[in-house]
């Protein structure tokens, strides 16, 4: 993969991962994004009482995954299964969905409200391309034709889930690494024709938005697998720098090439347009600020 492609893949992976992290931080620990998406779908007038199979089609999810979510949410009294097999929200479920929707709407608003009109239009076009991709189940849904100036919880979650799944699947097909572990290696890949890129632990914490403990354990694991080496920092006696090995370079090159192909299949040549990259860079900055502000939001 060339340096320009590596930069594009790094940018997209960061945007997707940080949106996913924001969603995960705002949902209760015992609730998955899939479970919340089901609750949110059942709040809509056209689908407030539907069969699980219908809900799966509306959400573009596997029926087995929806059935599992139904069981969990029913046990928590957030939805009920009616005598005819349809599912609907309980009063507690409707209240929980409303509170969580308010939280997620606030997060996504922080991410997009300071974008320029041009940047909003660029991102709206990207989402329309992805949702209306030929052969995609999303193409039959209203999301494909909606203008996305109002990037709310429902649309934000649908986009985040779709993009995260596509990227994560491509990574897992090529390697046994998690998406976060792959991003660890991806950040170490040089984005210009310069010397090898080396980063400190604190740099990785900032780039990946993870804890220091993850960076420590992941670096040991990735070193044992032969993807990176830890070298002493000449400017800091106690510091350690991370650097890709030749095996790590090859891994990043192969997986990044696959990820780039996935992005092109969804967005076409737009992935290479400078205006798109500028919009994504600004979005990434706003995501970082939104993640920092989560603790200060008035719940």
Language-model segments: residues:
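Alpha-helical linker/hinge and terminal dimerization helices associated
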Residues: 19-23, 59, 96, 100-115, ...
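N-terminal helix-turn-helix DNA-binding core of bacterial DNA-binding proteins
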Residues: 21-66, 70, 167-211
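N-terminal positioning helix adjacent to the helix-turn-helix/winged-helix DNA-binding module
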Residues: 31-35, 92, 119, 152, ...
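Charged, amphipathic alpha-helical coiled-coil/dimerization segments
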Residues: 71-121, 220-277
């Amino acid at each position: 993969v060339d340096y320009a492609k590596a930069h594009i893949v790094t940018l997209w992976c960061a945007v997707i991962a940080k949106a996913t992290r924001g969603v995960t931080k705002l949902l209760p620990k015992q609730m998955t994004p899939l479970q919340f998406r089901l609750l949110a779908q059942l709040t809509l007038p056209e689908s407030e009482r539907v069969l699980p199979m219908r809900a799966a089609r509306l959400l573009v999810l596997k029926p087995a995954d929806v059935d599992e979510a139904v069981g969990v949410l029913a046990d928590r009294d957030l939805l009920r299964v009616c005598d005819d097999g349809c599912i609907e929200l309980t009063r507690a479920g409707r209240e929980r969905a409303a509170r969580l929707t308010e939280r997620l709407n606030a997060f996504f608003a922080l991410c997009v409200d300071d974008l320029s009109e041009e940047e909003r239009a660029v991102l709206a076009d990207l989402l329309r391309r992805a949702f209306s991709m030929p052969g995609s189940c999303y193409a039959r849904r209203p999301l494909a034709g909606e203008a996305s100036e109002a990037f709310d919880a429902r649309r934000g979650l649908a986009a985040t889930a779709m993009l995260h799944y596509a990227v994560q699947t491509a990574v897992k097909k090529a390697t046994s690494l998690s998406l976060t572990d792959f991003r660890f290696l991806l950040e170490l890949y040089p984005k210009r024709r310069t010397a090898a890129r080396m980063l400190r632990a604190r740099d990785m914490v900032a780039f990946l938005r993870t804890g220091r403990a993850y960076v420590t354990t992941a670096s040991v694991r990735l070193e044992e697998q032969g993807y990176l080496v830890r070298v002493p920092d000449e400017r800091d006696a106690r510091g350690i720098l991370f650097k890709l090995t030749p095996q790590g370079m090859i891994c990043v090159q192969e997986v990044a090439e696959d990820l780039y192909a996935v992005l092109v299949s969804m967005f076409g040549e737009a992935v290479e347009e400078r205006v798109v990259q500028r919009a994504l860079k600004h979005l990434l900055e706003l995501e970082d600020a939104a993640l920092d502000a989560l603790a200060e939001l008035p719940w």
